[in-house]
Amino acid sequence: MAKEENKGSEQSGSDWKQFIYNPQKGEFMGRTASSWALILLFYLVFYGFLAGLFTLTMWVMLQTLDDSVPKYRDRVSSPGLMISPKSAGLEIKFSRSKTQSYMEYVQTLNTFLAPYNDSIQAKNEFCPPGLYFDQDEEVEKKTCQFNRTSLGICSGIEDPMFGYGEGKPCVIVKINRIIGLKPEGNPKINCTSKTEDVNLQYFPDNGKIDLMYFPYYGKKTHVNYVQPVVAVKISPSNFTSEEIAVECKIHGSRNLKNEDERDKFLGRVTFKVKITE
């Protein structure tokens, strides 16, 4: 019985060896050299054809795209709003007596407003207010000046602490960029707070967003563009450590939406400020 098992094992091993290489027929794993060559040639041609077809398809598709402007823009017809400094949960918390508690906010604002410095904006165009700055035919797009000094006491020039040291912080409300957007009417940022005895002051006056900063032509062609912003100074009448909820919306333009239950940042932004002694 043991001899029969050994004989079976030897036979099985011999069959495997013969399958891997059969010297009598000149076969490797059941195929001759010419058979393997034909199979390899077939797959080489087949996958080469697929790669060529994919490359051709991608090339044709890329010919239909503009390097500077997205092909499909109909799904983003109205811009969203965001604030600076942007913190986790859009909650700004600090103690006015502890400099370290708000220095990160101050540094963020300085970094954000650096491109708005008057020395940099002097290189841009002085544009007539209230008019679109159309440049469809221009290859190199120019930019209208938006000077940092127009943000008044929220510019960080008069008060390097942006009001945080006195417990009256400044928050920058910015509009997200959309290529080709032309707001109608007289757009402006308007903010409200449910907390009583809170004064909101805007820079520029009335939270105005001038039309001369539109349209935007894209990052690649509109190199020096800076979007218009509105600074909001939040001045509570007392410091009770109560959380101040502020909601800012775009108003005054019928083609800019500010209400959408599916997108809480479409034309609006809500943030909270908590100030302690």
Swiss-Prot record:
GO MF term set: ATPase activator activity
Tissue expression remark: Nervous system specific.
Pfam families: Na_K-ATPase
Spans within the Cytoplasmic topological domain: 1-35
GO biological process, one term: potassium ion import across plasma membrane
Glycosylation sites: N117, N147, N190, N238
GO cellular component: sodium:potassium-exchanging ATPase complex
Bilayer disposition of the protein: Single-pass type II membrane protein
Extracellular face of the membrane: 57-277
Listed Gene3D superfamilies: Na, k-atpase alpha subunit
Entry's transmembrane regions: 36-56
Disulfide bridge map: C127-C144, C154-C170, C191-C248
Keywords assigned by UniProt, alphabetized: Cell membrane, Disulfide bond, Glycoprotein, Ion transport, Membrane, Potassium, Potassium transport, Signal-anchor, Sodium, Sodium transport, Sodium/potassium transport, Transmembrane, Transmembrane helix, Transport
Cell location: Cell membrane
NCBIfam families: Na_K_ATPase_bet
Family statement: Belongs to the X(+)/potassium ATPases subunit beta family.
Function, in words: This is the non-catalytic component of the active enzyme, which catalyzes the hydrolysis of ATP coupled with the exchange of Na(+) and K(+) ions across the plasma membrane. The exact function of the beta-3 subunit is not known.
Oligomer status and interactors: The sodium/potassium-transporting ATPase is composed of a catalytic alpha subunit, an auxiliary non-catalytic beta subunit and an additional regulatory subunit.
Protein's name according to its UniProt entry: Sodium/potassium-transporting ATPase subunit beta-3
Taxonomy of the source species: Eukaryota, Metazoa, Chordata, Craniata, Vertebrata
